[in-house]
UniProtKB/Swiss-Prot annotation:
UniProt keyword Transit peptide present: no
Enzymatic class: lyase
Name used for this protein in its record: N-acetylmuramic acid 6-phosphate etherase 1
Catalytic reactions on record: N-acetyl-D-muramate 6-phosphate + H2O = N-acetyl-D-glucosamine 6-phosphate + (R)-lactate
Encoding gene (name): murQ1
Taxonomic placement: Bacteria, Bacillati, Bacillota, Bacilli, Lactobacillales
Function, as annotated: Specifically catalyzes the cleavage of the D-lactyl ether substituent of MurNAc 6-phosphate, producing GlcNAc 6-phosphate and D-lactate.
Length: 300
């Protein structure tokens, strides 16, 4: 049987003095209060930028060597992790096997609450064991409270295996922050609605994860200048986006960009190298392989 969790003293569970009368104000006043509280999120993120940068550097090194990004969490936190992982495939051509989310309660938990799942430390071990966690991998455990048993256990098991462990929470001095190799804890203060951590805490977690995964993609060469050069052009909109990226990066006409995209078999990065270095597709692929996919180094 699980011990009852003590929520006293958690910033995310405290009452917000500024919103105690939110049920008595006009709709405009209500959304103004929410907006004022939301502005505190970016300020909280600013204070943990060094930790986010450290997490990016450490995780990128593992990822370059074949390691995986494994996001673990329950409820909103777990869903945010899964969302971050899912988006890396269409945006940066990262294989779903290289970045994925594990939710307490399984795939059904993406759409509905699975009672008791977040309280099971054994379930986290089972899930990570099923995915054959190794020392090359990165475990990103996410929980607003910083003490959800499932997420705590994910860190504990990750450390036992030798994986890099990163926690994303919104409470200082939490078990997760103390256990993880790198702890990221933006303190956003009490929620607008007491304990509703899908609000400010969820927004903070989303911003941290956006920075984290984007930073890794920059480090591994999936971004040139500020262009997503490994986007998968799987539909008409994305084919046009890919064409525009090549046009911008190579400073050529749209018609030429389309020709290079076709010649590069719809791969954006080789198309840019072909256009700027005046080489064929195979040579462009070779050059990218020799420089870890970083176009800026190929063209230096």
């Amino acid at each position: 049987m699980c011990k009852q969790m003590n929520l006293e003293g958690l910033t995310t569970e405290a009452r917000n003095e500024a919103t105690k009368k939110i049920d008595q104000v006009s709709t405009l006043e209500m959304v103004t209060l929410i907006n004022q509280e939301d502005q505190k999120v970016a300020q909280a993120i600013e204070k943990v930028l060094p930790q986010i940068a450290a997490a990016i550097d450490a995780a990128a090194e593992r990822f370059k060597k074949g390691g995986r990004l494994i996001y673990c969490g329950a409820g909103t936190s777990g869903r945010l992790g899964a969302l971050d992982a899912i988006e890396l495939t269409p945006t940066y051509s990262v294989s779903p096997e290289r970045a994925f989310g594990i939710l307490a309660g399984g795939e059904k938990a993406m759409y509905q609450a699975i009672e008791g799942a977040e309280d099971s430390k054994e379930l986290a071990i089972e899930d990570l064991t099923q995915h054959q966690l190794t020392a090359r991998d990165v475990v990103i455990a996410i929980a607003a409270s910083g003490r959800t048993p499932y997420a705590v256990s994910a860190i504990e098991y990750g450390k036992k295996v030798g994986a890099l462990t990163i926690s994303v929470t919104c409470n200082n001095q939490s078990p997760m922050n103390q256990l993880a190799e790198i702890g990221i804890a933006p303190i956003v203060g009490p929620e607008v609605i007491t304990g509703s951590t899908r609000m400010k805490a969820g927004s903070a977690q989303k911003m941290v994860l956006n920075m984290f995964s984007t930073g890794i993609m920059v480090k591994v060469g999936n971004i040139y200048q500020n262009l997503m050069v490994n986007v998968q052009p799987t539909n008409e909109k994305l084919i046009q986006r890919a064409t525009n990226i090549i046009k911008e990066a190579a400073e050529i006409e749209e018609s030429q960009a389309k020709e290079y995209l076709e010649a590069a078999q719809l791969e954006v990065a080789p198309a840019i190298v072909m256009a700027k270095a005046h080489v064929d597709f195979q040579k462009a692929k070779q050059l990218l392989a020799e420089h870890d996919g970083r176009i800026s180094e190929v063209l230096a």
